Design a protein with these regions (language model features):
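Short, structured coil segments at secondary-structure junctions
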Residues: 7-8, 49
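A short acidic, helix-capping loop that chelates divalent metal ions and anchors anionic groups
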Residues: 20-23
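Conserved phosphate-binding/catalytic region of the ribokinase-like
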Residues: 25, 30-157
C-alpha cells in the first residue's frame, strides 16, 4: 500500500499478519501480546499517516492503537464455533457502530469482539449477524465490566 493511500485512512484494520507485512515488524505473541511490538507497529503506521490501527489477532484478541493510546481486548470464546464467515465484517461494523454510539475505542473494541463471537457461533454470513439485543445479552452473561450494555440502547432506535 502506498503512503499516499495510507495517509487517507483514519482507521485501518489489518489482521496481525497484514500489519506485520505493512509495518515491517511482527508482534510476538509467544508469551502473551508483546505491547512493545504493538507500539512499534502502531508507530510505523502513524509515520505513514494512519491515525488509528485496529489489529485483529484471532485467539489473541484485538488491539486498537493510535492517538488515544493502545487498547487490547481478549478474544470472546464461544462454546460452539460454526462458521467464521462474516466474523471480520461484523467485528469492523460493530467497532464503527460502537464509536458512533459514543463508546471510547477500548469499549468499542470489546463490543466488536462480543459481536464477532456471536457471528462465528452461527452458520452463514447474513444469518450469523447478531442484533444489538443479542450482543447486550452476551455482555451481561459474560459479566463484562467495561461499560453498561444499556449504553447501546440508543442503537435500537
Amino acid at each position: 500500500m502506498s503512503d499516499r493511500l495510507l495517509a487517507c485512512a483514519t482507521y485501518l484494520s489489518p489482521n496481525e499478519h497484514e500489519a506485520a507485512i505493512l509495518a515491517g515488524h511482527s508482534i510476538d505473541v509467544s508469551n502473551g501480546i508483546n505491547m512493545e511490538d504493538v507500539a512499534v507497529v502502531s508507530q510505523a503506521f502513524q509515520a505513514r499517516g494512519v491515525e488509528n490501527l485496529i489489529i485483529t489477532m484471532g485467539e489473541n484478541g484485538s488491539i486498537a492503537a493510535g492517538k488515544n493510546g493502545i487498547h487490547h481486548t481478549h478474544c470472546v470464546k464461544m462454546e460452539h464455533v460454526a462458521d467464521p464467515t462474516a466474523a471480520g465484517d461484523s467485528f469492523v461494523a460493530a467497532f464503527c457502530t460502537g464509536l458512533t454510539a459514543g463508546l471510547p475505542q477500548g469499549e468499542a473494541l470489546a463490543f466488536a469482539s462480543h459481536t464477532a463471537a456471536i457471528t462465528v457461533s452461527r452458520m452463514g454470513a447474513m444469518p450469523s449477524l447478531p442484533t444489538v439485543e443479542e450482543v447486550q445479552q452476551l455482555l451481561v452473561e459474560r459479566d463484562y465490566q467495561g461499560f453498561d450494555p444499556a449504553e447501546l440502547d440508543a442503537l435500537k432506535q
